[in-house]
Amino acid sequence: MSATLRFGEGNLQYDAQGRLRHLLSTEGLRERELLQILDTAESFLSIANRSVKKTPTLRGRTIANLFFENSTRTRSTFELAAKRLSADVLNIAVSTSSASKGESLTDTIDNLMAMQVDGFVIRHPEAGAAHLVARHLGDSALVVNAGDGQHAHPTQALLDVFTIRRLGGPIEDRVVAIVGDVFHSRVARSQIHALSVLGCPEIRVIGPRTLVPEELSALGVHVYHDLQAGLRGVDVICALRLQRERMESHRLPSLDEFHRRFGLTPERLQWAEPGALVLHPGPMNRGVEIASEVADGAQAVILQQVAHGLAVRMAVLAILAGAAGGA
């Protein structure tokens, strides 16, 4: 399959009129679309406080969730986002679908399109899977990348940026540090692109040499292999999960060694600016990349990220469907 995933060709995210039709990566997104998503998400936040938590924005539309990897937060919030927009939702259990019998991804999509599906949310272990589907469908249905291999996770980056903007102040005044397993992280790459477009003055990446790709410096980020030096002057800390399921054994001596050098503890949090926000995309490895005292502490905004993720994903679906315009 990977030989067909030429996801570097062109920008499939925009239609012929220059409108955002698919969300595949934060790379290649213009500032105006990023701001449109963030501002629309702000308007959708209030729905959670209503007695009837729905808006008719996508009434009559059908959204299919295809998750080829395990997920709790992303899958749940996409399902709830579509339902709160009044869409019909198909949750495809890939382990019991024809895909488990060898059916190709595009054949699966074609069969669902025959049922008049209007949009697809796709998580897949191979980088470029969502791009393959978007190229296959063109403008006939919207596609949202919910994570593809180590490549991208755009909605996670958008909800992180939304959280920073809402709780931490203007992004153009914040110094942001991304700490941990950057090598395997699709989230980090997506965060870097989004923060850069929105004018973040300094993005730092902190981690052991084996878990920080050398080519990141080409994106304009500052790379640190010492946690104390990297956290000095930082306003926002994004801690990343150690992705042991993707990791080759030689990249990490031990979990204890990682925590000793790069784990975020209350004492180390003091190296950053007073009141620095702490984010984590989840799921957390408590006692490895983040101590429970920090994860549950006053500076952590991890549960707020989850709540914001629902509003951001509602905004993405509404905008891609051409139906944004009010909650």
Swiss-Prot record:
Check the record and name the Pfam families matching this protein. OTCace, OTCace_N
Q: Does the keyword Ligase apply?
A: no
Q: Which reaction does it catalyse?
A: carbamoyl phosphate + L-aspartate = N-carbamoyl-L-aspartate + phosphate + H(+)
Q: Name one GO biological process term.
A: amino acid metabolic process
From the UniProt record, give the pathway where this protein acts: Pyrimidine metabolism; UMP biosynthesis via de novo pathway; (S)-dihydroorotate from bicarbonate: step 2/3
Q: What is its EC number?
A: 2.1.3.2
Residues annotated as coiled-coil are none
Query: Which keywords, in A-to-Z order, does the entry hold?
Result: Pyrimidine biosynthesis, Transferase
SUPFAM superfamilies from the entry? Aspartate/ornithine carbamoyltransferase
Where along the chain is L-aspartate bound? 101, 186, 241
GO cellular component terms listed in the entry, alphabetical order: cytosol
**What function does the entry list?**
Catalyzes the condensation of carbamoyl phosphate and aspartate to form carbamoyl aspartate and inorganic phosphate, the committed step in the de novo pyrimidine nucleotide biosynthesis pathway.
HAMAP family reported in the protein's UniProt record: Asp_carb_tr
Q: What name is this protein filed under?
A: Aspartate carbamoyltransferase catalytic subunit
Species the sequence originates in? Acidithiobacillus ferrooxidans (strain ATCC 23270 / DSM 14882 / CIP 104768 / NCIMB 8455) (Ferrobacillus ferrooxidans (strain ATCC 23270))
